[in-house]
Amino acid sequence: MLNVVILAAGLGKRMQSDLPKVLHTLAGRPMLDHVIGSARQLQPARIIVVVGHGADRVKAAFEGQPGLQFALQQPQHGTGHAVQQAVPQLLEGDGEDDVTLVLYGDVPLVQPATLQNLLQARGRGVAVLTEVLADSTGYGRIVRDAQGQVCRIVEHKDASEAERAIKEVNTGILAAPTARLKDWLGRITNDNAQGEYYLTDVIGLAVGDGVPVGAAQPGASWETLGVNSRVQQAQLERAWQSELARRQLEAGVTLADPARFDVRGTLSCGRDVFIDVGCVFEGTVTLGDGVRVGPHCVLRDVAVQAGARIEAYSHLQQAKVGQEAVVGPYARLRPGADLGERSHVGNFVEIKNSVLQADSKANHLAYIGDADIGARVNVGAGTITCNYDGVNKHRTVIEDDAFIGSDTQLVAPVRVGKGATLGAGTTLTKDAPAGQLTISRARQSTIEGWKRPVKKS
């Protein structure tokens, strides 16, 4: 049985923020959410988040998540004291296979594979996640005995000169038998330079009790990087985005510049996808085979089918784009926009909660809201569906093969029949019959002999 305890009680003073540190985002998600996500991959019986500063806000951010519980650390007296607060909620069976894994809410990128390796490294005892650093200043040092076995961890402030020369450091992440961990937590003291209860002291207690202590290392150095300041947050953001870019490149995606690419959610790409510079992908985004995304586009919760093109500076949110459709440049698809195959949505066109079926086009300067547009429809420049009467929204229906002239207003609810034509400048307030020309503008006239006024001297 596996328990996971995540320490998330810290103030984060150096963040200079009223927001609890673990709620600051990395790749569009709270740091704590990354840790919980990795923990869930291990299928634990219980996840316990130890909260302190901003406890109510942290709880509210994750309220209702299954298998998630909270323990309060108030005041904060160190990492050992933090885990002590979770002890009453730890699930325990009958043997050494009952394990508690301790993670940190401000070390957001530790990967499930690394945690699996750590659990395997403990055997029937304890395991710590360690790393070798060129500059180990500030970290707890891993002290090994003559046989190379981990015998204790000493914090930097309590370390001797010889111990400070050690390059192998403690990441803070460990796994231990639950029953023994409870016992060791009851035996640690605050007799140290900080006057705190260190979780690391359980290693010395384990060795004293004859319990073997193993060690594992992360798959990548960025996995154990913590965040204590805005600078570190920005550095870790770039490290993670670089990793996400590498994964896309290895999967066959072409990135014009991997250093100018941001994923703040999940991006799934088919074959031969091209992504230009400065693009941001949020939520869940799917790009089909051969999709091309132009520079500086933002896609949030979007599905783009094969062969489609998203041109420069377009913003798409909760939208669907059909095969070989073209969007942009400078287009905006709002929630509920659904473009059929080979449809075109051009510059300065906004579409919201509307369907544009195959081969239809709205190439310039239009607003299409709450509309159902059939196939092979041409929507002229300056067209507006007037969908809101000040209280309620109404739908516009434009059937197949209709032609909507420029500068037309369609006052919903209204229907344009199949093959109908609306003359430029029409304000449509009644249904337009199929196959007919409907026009509402005044008849053009010329005033003979009219002259412009002359400016008086």
From Swiss-Prot:
Cofactor(s) of this protein: Mg(2+)
EC id: 2.7.7.23, 2.3.1.157
Ranges where the record places region Linker: 231-251
UniProt remark on cofactor binding: Binds 1 Mg(2+) ion per subunit.
InterPro entries: Bifunctional_GlmU (IPR005882), GlmU-like (IPR050065), GlmU_C_LbH (IPR038009), Hexapep (IPR001451), Hexapep_transf_CS (IPR018357), MobA-like_NTP_Trfase (IPR025877), Nucleotide-diphossugar_trans (IPR029044), Trimer_LpxA-like_sf (IPR011004)
Sites where the protein binds UDP-N-acetyl-alpha-D-glucosamine: 7-10, 21, 73, 78-79, 104-106, 140, 155, 170, 228, 334, 352, 367, 378
Binding sites annotated in the UniProt record for acetyl-CoA: A381, N387, Y388, S406, A424, R441
Intracellular or extracellular location(s): Cytoplasm
SUPFAM superfamilies, A to Z: Nucleotide-diphospho-sugar transferases, Trimeric LpxA-like enzymes
GO biological process assignments: cell morphogenesis; cell wall organization; lipid A biosynthetic process; peptidoglycan biosynthetic process; regulation of cell shape; UDP-N-acetylglucosamine biosynthetic process
Keyword Acetylation among UniProt keywords: no
PANTHER family (alphabetical): BIFUNCTIONAL PROTEIN GLMU, NUCLEOTIDYL TRANSFERASE
Protein name: Bifunctional protein GlmU
Organism, as annotated: Bordetella pertussis (strain Tohama I / ATCC BAA-589 / NCTC 13251)
Lineage of producing organism: Bacteria, Pseudomonadati, Pseudomonadota, Betaproteobacteria, Burkholderiales
